């Protein structure tokens, strides 16, 4: 390869790379309604639109098999794809599964992976309809493509937020990141002392959020029951701050969120204190929560405020006001996209 005009991938990050590679792509087929730039592509085949999303998971980058059971990995691999479809206000229907496997894996290992994969599919009513397998010299690689459907007038994009809209999140944030920190800590201890027995007592919730996340179909169902169509929506995979800035950038808006309104579980707060970490920072930037971040018109306040598992954390503003966090003592800090980035230089 020529060394002239060489730009390191780490200087632009994951989303910068995607933009660079796809900014000149033009859709050629009328059925291709929306391509790169959201949680899933949208294909129009009549009264319903088809949603398509793909995730690639690499051993050593996205997961560590020292502490990740293969059954859990199979479950999580499916769930992260379903979450993207739900984030478009759609319903996942089918997946294809492709694996690159090194010689250290046996058939029984892959059966464990598929056991978790099938469990997730059964719970969400999704069919496994194809895929591919090949060999690998660098460990395990997983590529899953998920197809879903949504009615034409129900698809929700990232770019629809409007000034005065309420910013809402489901569940609680930061727990998955704390679970990862706990597992990494115990791994470091284990590697230094073979006789150690990890103690996870009282931290089971954090481990579950990291190893076995859930896609929030229940929230999508609740929104439908209330007759609410969000103006914008994403799932929180890279961190609240990063995802919120994606919504504001694509919607050409600003935002204000309030620290005291960010939902944080008790175990998350305890673990953050134990690790001498700021729990709000963990909630903003931790990632892998797979909760839903969405905006709704101010007129829907009463409905969303009464929804179980949903918290209103702020509002959308004019773009010139930027994106900011209001702390408990009233100070205003600029939000920065410091969430997880697989292409960042170590």
Indicate where each model-derived feature is located.
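Extreme N-terminal cap/leader segments of soluble proteins
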Residues: 1-69, 88, 97, 345-346
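Glycine-/charge-enriched secondary-structure boundary and capping motifs
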Residues: 2-16, 20-26, 104-127, 137-142, ...
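Glycine-rich anion/phosphate-binding loops
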Residues: 34, 66-80, 104-115, 153
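Residue-level signal for inorganic ion chemistry
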Residues: 42, 81, 89, 128, ...
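Glycine-rich anion-binding loops of enzyme active sites
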Residues: 57, 93-186, 315
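Small-aliphatic-rich amphipathic alpha-helix that forms the alpha element of a beta-alpha
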Residues: 70-94, 115-123, 222, 242-247
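Short, compositionally biased
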Residues: 179-200
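Polyanion-binding loop/helix "lid" in catalytic or ligand-binding cores
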Residues: 197-244
């Amino acid at each position: 390869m020529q060394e002239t005009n060489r730009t390191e991938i780490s200087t632009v990050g994951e989303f910068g790379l995607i933009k660079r590679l796809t900014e000149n792509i033009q859709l050629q087929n009328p059925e291709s309604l929306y391509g790169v730039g959201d949680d899933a592509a949208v294909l129009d085949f009549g009264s319903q639109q088809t949603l398509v999303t793909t995730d690639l998971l690499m051993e050593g980058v996205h997961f560590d098999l020292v502490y990740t059971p293969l059954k859990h990995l199979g479950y999580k691999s499916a769930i992260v794809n379903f979450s993207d479809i739900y984030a478009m206000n759609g319903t996942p229907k089918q997946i294809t599964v492709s694996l690159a496997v090194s010689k250290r894996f046996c058939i029984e290992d892959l059966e464990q992976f598929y056991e978790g994969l099938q469990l997730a599919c059964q719970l969400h009513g999704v069919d496994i309809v194809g895929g591919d397998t090949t060999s690998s010299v660098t460990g395990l690689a997983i590529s899953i493509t998920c197809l879903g459907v949504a009615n034409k007038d129900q698809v929700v994009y990232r770019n629809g937020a409007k000034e005065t809209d309420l910013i809402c999140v489901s569940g609680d944030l930061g727990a998955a990141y704390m679970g990862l920190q706990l597992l990494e800590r115990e791994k470091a201890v284990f590697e230094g002392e073979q006789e150690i027995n990890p103690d996870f007592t009282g931290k089971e919730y954090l481990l579950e959020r990291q190893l076995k996340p859930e896609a929030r179909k229940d929230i999508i169902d609740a929104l439908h029951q209330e007759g609410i169509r969000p103006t914008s929506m994403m799932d929180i995979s890279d961190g609240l701050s990063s995802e919120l800035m994606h919504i504001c950038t694509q919607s050409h808006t600003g935002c204000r969120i309030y620290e005291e309104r960010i939902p944080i579980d008790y175990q998350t707060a305890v673990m953050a204190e134990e690790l001498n970490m700021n729990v709000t920072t963990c909630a903003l930037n931790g990632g892998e929560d797979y909760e839903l971040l969405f905006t709704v018109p101010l007129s829907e306040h009463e409905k969303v405020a009464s929804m179980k598992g949903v918290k209103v954390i702020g509002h959308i503003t004019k773009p010139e006001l930027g994106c900011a966090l209001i702390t408990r003592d009233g100070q205003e800090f600029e939000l920065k996209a410091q969430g997880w980035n697989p292409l960042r230089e170590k």
